[in-house]
Amino acid sequence: MIYPFFCASLPTLLPGVPPELSVEDFDASAREYLSAADFAALISIDSKNPAEYSVEIYRKLREFQDYLKWKIALLRSERLKRSDRFTPPDEFFGEVDFAIPVLAAAEPVEREKLLDALIFQKLDELEIFHEMDLTALCIYRLKLGILQKYAKWNEINGKNNFEAALEKLAADFNEL
């Protein structure tokens, strides 16, 4: 089913720009416009069990994320000279292989930002040919979640929390 009025009312999402609405606000609006079955499919991504995903786009995104994690684990095990065995995922995403060495070497926060940028880019690709349908709304919700995560981040508070944690660790270490 298509939802032209609902889709047209949604603000545009751009990478790096805080969203104008939250996932919760989007879900509240979606509940009004979508059928009960489509709304259940839309929020099926919230399930921790991929078998419960009702929309194909969620399964495709999960395969993409699994591939990224597999490549990072493989590269890190090679770098650490470990003999871990990793089973490759079914799908191959060669378009991101150039970024894997950067991801494997990055600090955790930077790695997460880079992964989210790759996921956002993949969502843009998956959005092609899906305008105003349930898949487009699912992609919109995923992008909104990524952008909302970074809108809540505060570098100053994060830095202060990090420094406080380091001071506590240093104090605990000095007590030993």
Question: Predicted segment positions?
Answer:
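Extended alpha-helical surfaces
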Residues: 1-176
